């Protein structure tokens, strides 16, 4: 399958630049792939009538965008990705062709680092002191994606994180979760709607476009995740009772599908990793997740391919076209979709 089959054109005016005035107030498009039906709702709060068992990803996006001064006194932007050791990190770097192995950079508080190795725009940084999460919290900005074309705003520190985020480790926020408000969680409890949490740390590769000409040739990145024993038991019981499992965000779906043993009807629990790549043509059979809540995804991304596998590629592109024509807002701060079943 050709990667370009997952391209679509989108006016910049439909890429939402700011969060909604209130969590949950974004528009919701409800989709039934089996009946090929599309329903338009004026807010995410309309989700309640469709659901009875939800699973969220409670990873928290690290404040990871930071600026340093090069030996030539120019400003260089780094996006911290993963911790290798107490003073070793992988990172993406701006002006990457000019940043070479052996270069030194001055960070806030006089912290120095050196590029130890480099692969394209990704580098390994060695700091001259150990670096804790408190340093990033103090000196870094939240990692807004490149399609948000504006200056950083203080509101992003709150609204680019979900209200239930708990464990720092993601390179980017699992943004469909941004819609969920405290009022909506209260409504879950008042309506006896179950919810639980897993933790999957979102990697940079999640949101990058597929570069290979053929989808099948894409080298899928690994992401680490954790499913606790008691969460696994609750989910397994919900499934046995015939409840329909709603995955909040695609990253949650990847973790659940990677960990669930369809023969034993059980999850593997504890710390794990996955490079599961779900796309149309793979003939992937979804084992555990029945419904999916997510945002609109970027062209040629693995997330768009996953949704196309879940709901059917032709149906996905038909409702994307309808959403564009009706002025839905796209991507991280945009509107949401609820897919009621998979094909």
From Swiss-Prot:
It holds the Pfam family Queuosine_synth. Its EC number is 2.4.99.17. It is found in: Cytoplasm. The keyword Glycoprotein does not apply. GO terms for molecular function: S-adenosylmethionine:tRNA ribosyltransferase-isomerase activity. Transfers and isomerizes the ribose moiety from AdoMet to the 7-aminomethyl group of 7-deazaguanine (preQ1-tRNA) to give epoxyqueuosine (oQ-tRNA). Monomer. This is S-adenosylmethionine:tRNA ribosyltransferase-isomerase. The gene is queA.
């Amino acid at each position: 399958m050709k990667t370009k089959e997952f391209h679509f054109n989108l006016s910049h005016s439909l890429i939402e630049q700011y969060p909604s005035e209130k969590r949950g107030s974004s528009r919701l498009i409800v989709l039934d792939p089996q009946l090929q039906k599309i329903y338009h709702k004026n807010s995410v709060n309309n989700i309640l009538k469709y659901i009875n068992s939800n699973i969220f990803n409670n990873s928290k996006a690290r404040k990871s965008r930071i600026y340093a001064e090069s030996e030539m006194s120019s400003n260089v932007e780094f996006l911290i990705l993963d911790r290798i050791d107490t003073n070793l990190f992988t990172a993406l770097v701006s002006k990457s062709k000019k940043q070479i192995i052996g270069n030194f950079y001055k960070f806030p508080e006089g912290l120095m680092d050196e590029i130890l190795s480099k692969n394209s725009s990704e580098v390994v940084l060695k700091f001259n002191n150990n670096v804790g999460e408190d340093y990033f919290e103090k000196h870094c900005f939240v990692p807004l994606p490149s399609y948000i074309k504006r200056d950083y705003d203080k509101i992003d520190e709150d609204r680019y994180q979900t209200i239930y985020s708990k464990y720092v480790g993601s390179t980017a926020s699992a943004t469909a979760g941004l819609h969920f408000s405290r009022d909506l969680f209260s409504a879950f409890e008042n309506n006896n709607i179950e919810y639980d949490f897993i933790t999957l740390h979102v990697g940079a590769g999640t949101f990058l476009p597929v570069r290979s000409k053929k989808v099948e040739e894409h080298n899928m990145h690994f992401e680490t995740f954790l499913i606790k024993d008691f969460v696994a038991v609750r989910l397994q019981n919900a499934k046995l009772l015939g409840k329909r499992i709603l995955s909040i965000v695609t990253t949650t779906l990847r973790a659940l599908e990677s960990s669930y043993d369809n023969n034993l009807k059980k999850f593997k629990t504890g710390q794990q990793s996955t490079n599961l790549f779900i796309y149309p043509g793979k003939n992937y059979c979804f084992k555990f997740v029945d419904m999916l809540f997510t945002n609109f995804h970027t062209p040629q991304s693995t997330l768009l391919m996953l949704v196309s596998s879940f709901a059917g590629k032709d149906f996905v592109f038909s409702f994307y076209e309808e959403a564009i024509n009706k002025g839905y807002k796209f991507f991280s701060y945009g509107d949401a979709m609820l897919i009621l079943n998979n094909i």
